[in-house]
């Protein structure tokens, strides 16, 4: 758990004073070796560069420490003044241990100011309200999470089912485009004419059968006439069947009359029919 931020202005001021009171020793005198050999010459050449690091850098270190101590004192002063100002401002509303403020602080018109009304609300009451609100929302959040988890597989399944449909539509569109470009595709099915009902376009089966039978009935008498002519070849006209009467006028029933020719005179119904019996 993180500790609350707290600044001790008194301790900060004491640390700044201790830092500013540090005393640094004086740098030693430069070292010089007398002699003429090569070792003496090397020492006299190397030592000044080493000593200069201390002698030249020590004043800068002292100045930096002094500046840091001064900044620490300034920060401690700022913290102290800010704490005092906040304490004075809060003391005007007389905050106590219970968190209640004075209700007697009023505005110029005699009505409590908005700040007084806000500050007069107990802190414990606000905390209680927040806790109750969080307790009411917790069950709803807990109940919503499982529903979202259950709906996730359905969403994935729907996306998978939609993929084949999209592929089918794409293939159909490509086939239609290829048929339009090639110009040699299957002819579309022709719909029934809107002017003629479907019942009239389709001829009933029994009507077709009757028409076929009627055609066969028309052809059959002609065949009978041809056979009769073949059998009666070489016979006398009186002995030939039909006696020159058209085949349509022949009848095997007793008392039947030959059909009248369109050019023949009308026959009286009361006149008896001539006999067509042939004597052998």
UniProtKB/Swiss-Prot annotation:
Phosphorylated at Ser-70. Its main location: secreted. Induction: Induced during stationary phase. Residues 167-181, 246-280 have a biased composition (Low complexity). Changing residue 70 to A: Lack of phosphorylation. Increases the growth of mycobacteria. One of its GO terms (cellular component) is extracellular region. The keyword Thylakoid does not apply. Keywords: Phosphoprotein, Secreted, Virulence. It is found in: Secreted. The keyword Secreted applies. The modification Phosphoserine is found at residue 70. Disruption phenotype: Inactivation does not abolish EsxA (ESAT-6) secretion, EsxA-specific immunogenicity and enhanced virulence. Deletion mutants multiply more efficiently compared to wild-type strains. Residues 167-280 are annotated as: Disordered. Coiled coil: none annotated. Disulfide bonds: none annotated. Could be involved in regulation of growth and intracellular survival. Elicits a prominent immune response in human tuberculosis patients. Contains several epitopes, particularly in the C-terminal region. This is ESX-1 secretion-associated protein EspJ. It comes from Mycobacterium tuberculosis (strain ATCC 25618 / H37Rv). The gene is espJ.
